A protein has these predicted regions:
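Phosphate-binding site recognition
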Residues: 1-336, 340
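A cross-kingdom feature that marks ATP-driven nucleic-acid transaction machinery
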Residues: 305-441
Length: 441
């Protein structure tokens, strides 16, 4: 798949490159796996304006890794390094020395993998960076996919690289407008049902969008056929990513995510399931990993107990529901039955994805300053999307329905009255109500 969009990110990265020609800069580029960090770096810097060196860090002995990286550095930068570097610190020093002579960009891909190869590398980099960065012109960008490790490396004040980065860019999945642009390029006559299917299985993550587009899987049926095919790369993806992300705590986190996906969404339910306190694990799933969202009614108190947890990543929602839950069928070689079940349940399952789509679209269109859902404690009244524009002093209340014929305007008006009864300070704001359906995508 060719490169699409990312104009804001490209502008920021190229601005940093310009600044690095005065003094070295150290940028951390992070985001979930498969979101397109490597491709973004290449698009931003591999344009011939200054030399661009990309060094991918892989899981192998440091001596072997350094030999490969030194060979690549010598090829791209035409370095004349005497001897063979056996430690990355030795190679990094040579690369910093080169930046004394000329400006260039160095991208280190999967930077967190040094934690497995040799965690001492981070201390080596810190000492060398401190020695050289004020007298060199290096645009250093480190890419990392594992939030747990990247947060530890750069934002834990006990770690050597704490405070060394001069900037941080978090790359998000494609938003609705860019996803539509990509889909239109491959299938100009796509339908909104096709778009909803693509959003549901990919969540806008570049790798999974590419997976579908490259396979010419443009309809729901074609996407499900691709996902559950014998050669599918989608099936093992969830377990692979989570094992890397969670490390030794993999079992606990995996159990929590599976339970939340199955409908056990309150702290009490999850505590009973594991037989231990889960608050710390849930907080990390939300704050560090961005896989889970703690949902509570908009305008509610942060300490409110009227809250529940949801898997907030469309890919993982789909993977836990139709891959992990049906793993017994996969073990029997019956991916055809997995596909049939996904086809049968897709309409109900994709309702939440449609709600997330419209939430993302409203935010992307800058149509609010606060957005969320609202429900009362008894669960009798629930509004899918509530938006507030604090500048215009307005509110909007939306029901999200795949089938527009199921929308009940009178019932929504009753829910809005219940909302104002619980939030009387909002009653004087101008407001509107409406339906958001598949036709509005």
């Amino acid at each position: 798949m060719r490169f699409f969009g990312r104009e804001i990110e490209l502008k920021e990265l190229r601005k940093v490159r310009e600044l690095s020609q005065e003094r070295s800069r150290f940028t951390v580029l992070t985001g979930r796996r498969r979101v397109g960090k490597t491709e973004l770096s290449r698009e931003a810097f591999d344009d011939g304006k200054t030399p661009y060196l990309n060094l991918p860090i892989t899981r192998q002995p440091e001596v072997t890794l350094c030999a490969q990286l030194q060979e690549e550095a010598e090829r791209v930068l035409h370095l004349g390094i005497h001897g063979t570097c056996t430690r990355f610190g030795e190679l990094f020093r040579e690369l910093m020395k080169e930046a004394e002579r000329r400006p260039y960009t160095l991208v280190i891909d999967e930077f967190q993998e040094f934690d497995r190869t040799n965690p001492g590398v981070y201390g080596d980099i810190q000492h060398i960076w401190d020695e050289y960065h004020n007298k060199t012109k290096l645009n250093l960008v480190v890419n990392g996919s594992v939030n747990r490790l990247m947060n530890k490396i750069f934002f834990d004040d006990s770690q050597p690289l704490y405070g060394r980065n001069t900037g941080t860019l978090i790359l998000k999945p494609f938003g609705p407008s860019l996803l539509k642009e990509i889909f239109r390029c491959y299938k100009p006559d796509y339908t909104n049902s096709d778009l909803l299917a693509l959003w549901t299985v990919s969540g806008g993550v570049a790798r999974y969008v590419d997976m579908m587009m490259s396979a010419h899987a443009f309809t729901k049926a074609e996407m499900l056929e691709e996902i559950f095919s014998p050669l599918s790369a989608y099936i093992p993806e969830g377990r692979t990513i989570l094992a890397d992300e969670f490390g030794s705590d993999y079992g606990t986190y995996f159990t929590l995510l599976a339970a939340i996906s199955a409908g056990q969404t309150t702290s009490a339910e999850l505590k009973n399931l594991l037989g231990t306190e889960v608050g710390g694990f849930l907080a990390k799933l939300e704050d560090q990993y961005s896989i889970v969202e703690k949902k509570q009614p908009i305008f509610g108190k942060p300490t409110s107990k009227n809250a529940h947890f949801q898997v907030d990543d469309c890919f993982f929602r789909f993977w836990f529901r139709f891959v992990h839950k049906l793993s017994y069928l996969n073990e029997l070689g019956r991916r055809d039955r997995m596909r049939d079940i996904a086809e049968r349940d897709f309409g109900v399952f994709s309702g939440y994805a449609l709600e997330r789509y419209f939430t993302a679209k409203i935010v992307e269109d800058k149509g609010c300053t606060r957005i969320g859902s609202w429900w009362d404690r008894k669960g009798e009244n629930e509004i899918d999307i509530v938006c507030e524009d604090e500048i215009a002093e307005t509110l909007a209340f939306y029901e999200v329905k795949i089938d527009a014929s199921r929308f009940d305007a009178t019932r929504l008006a009753e829910k809005v009255e219940a909302f104002f009864a619980k939030n009387p300070d909002k009653r004087n704001l101008h407001y509107k109500t409406g339906l958001l359906s598949i036709g509005d995508m």
